[in-house]
Amino acid sequence: MEIIEGKMPFMGYETHYRIVGRRSEKSPLVLLHGGPGSTHNYFEVLDKLAKIDDRRIIMYDQLGCGNSSIPDDHPELYTKETWVKELKTLREHLALRKIHLLGQSWGGMLAIIYMCDYHPEGIQSLILSSTLSSASLWSKELHRMIKYLPIEEQAAIHRAELTDTFTEPDYLKANEHFMNQHAIDMKKKWPECVMREKKGGTVAYETAWGPNEYTPEGNLHDYEYTDQLSKIKVPTLITSGTDDLCTPYVAKTMHDHIAGSQWKLFENCSHMSFVQKTDEYIAMLKKWLDAND
């Protein structure tokens, strides 16, 4: 299977991209990773979709992580405006006139911002994977789920938030337990691309989002797009897991506000259903993409 990797000049830095599959008449699928700062790595589990569907799959490391430039000495660059500009620049650089767009977690937020604020042309369809339209609802839902943790772990998280200290061992243990339950359990064995140590991303994450998933205090703290979702007019598929950080309430909120959207809930999956049920996810994507080319 053909894989091309390259670098794109961007704002005096470089953005690393990866293209899987050969050029065909079908519109390519562009993947937006989460974080901010999580890198494209885990998306490599979707590589075989390129062969199965004869379609190019394009992924990239957003500025601040992975094989792209990591200008951590300029954290003011880590904003939604920068990352939207990077996506627009990538489309121009690779001449991506018509695409399908999939955003996972923060990548879905980026896709929503792009669709609602910039009204791009050439988007054949949108896939919102385990993402959110409201930072406040997300935080509220995650704090609800924290109440299912053991009492001592709840207390450790509460103390950390109260004192704005997120380095104590008891907090770190509690947060790890929570993320293993609802993001992905890293104690299990996953494909190499999922287990691969990522480069950078911490400064981007803490600058834009915050110290953890449930304390959004970075520059995205006021991310509130639920009431703007009606601006999305392209075919939209929402995916999430039953044990996801993106709770069914979060997913249904997006589904209810995007006319004609579809929602697929993956049983016994958390924040990465495409990793936990890869074959089922790829089959779903193939059917969706072929129907909306």
Swiss-Prot record:
Active-site residues, Swiss-Prot/TrEMBL: 105, 244, 271
EC primary class: hydrolase
Domain of life according to the entry: Bacteria
EC code(s) of this entry: 3.4.11.5
GO cellular component terms given for this protein: cell envelope; membrane
This protein's UniProt keywords: Aminopeptidase, Hydrolase, Protease
Residue span, AB hydrolase-1 domain: 28-277
Reaction(s) this enzyme catalyzes, per UniProt: Release of N-terminal proline from a peptide
Main location: other
BP GO annotations: proteolysis
Protein location: Cell envelope
A Pfam family the protein falls into: Abhydrolase_1
Database matches in InterPro entries: AB_hydrolase_1, AB_hydrolase_fold, AB_hydrolase_sf, Peptidase_S33, Pro_imino_pep
Gene Ontology molecular function: aminopeptidase activity
Family the UniProt entry places it in: Belongs to the peptidase S33 family.
Role: Releases the N-terminal proline from various substrates.
Protein name: Proline iminopeptidase
Gene: pip
